[in-house]
Design a protein with these regions (language model features):
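Structured-RNA-binding interfaces characteristic of tRNA pseudouridine synthases
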Residues: 1-170
Length: 170
């Protein structure tokens, strides 16, 4: 009852839904207000504090682009490349909530949750902007921010066409 088919497209016989994906869009929701979102509590991280959005946006700019995201990967034994491209990290604030939309060519194990924890640490002034840039160089999971809870995270869309842009998908 939570999943619905919104579109059907004919694909080649050798198409693989995971291997042929060219990108993904994830949304992470954070409650920052004093009033609890009772009916949404399973789908939103109740952070309970209001971080500095301007600092978080500046940190997001540092993380956008093609980088080695090993510091943001929970799998310490990752054998494959940890280089990924984040096309955009969009932060919006509305009614006691922060919504972060991540668009990229692929994401590592717990990468979105670790990125979110790191952005929140910056927003709470527990981490400097310069330390965010250093995380891309040191490639050490222990240096990055906390892993935000899974309940705020939603896979919004899987992209398949190299021509498909975020503006066409939302």
């Amino acid at each position: 009852e939570d999943i619905a088919v919104s579109e059907v497209t004919e694909v080649p016989e050798r198409f693989h839904s995971r291997l042929n994906a060219t990108g993904k869009i994830y949304v992470y929701r954070i409650a920052t207000g004093e009033v609890k979102k009772v009916f949404e509590r399973r789908y939103i991280y109740d952070f309970g504090e209001k971080p500095d959005m301007e600092l978080m946006c500046r940190a997001a700019e540092i993380l956008t682009g093609t980088h080695d995201f090993k510091s943001f990967c929970a799998n310490r034994r990752m054998k494959k490349s940890t280089v990924r491209t984040i096309y955009s990290i969009d932060l919006k604030e509305k009614e006691g909530e922060i919504v972060i939309t991540y668009t990229g060519n692929g994401f590592l194990h717990h990468m979105i949750r670790i990125l979110t924890g790191t952005l929140l640490e910056v927003g709470m002034k527990k981490r400097s902007l310069s330390s965010v840039a250093e995380l891309l160089e040191v490639r050490d999971r222990e240096k990055a921010g906390f892993t935000a809870p899974a309940k705020g995270l939603t896979l919004e869309k899987v992209l398949y066409s190299p021509l498909q842009k975020e503006s066409e998908t939302l």
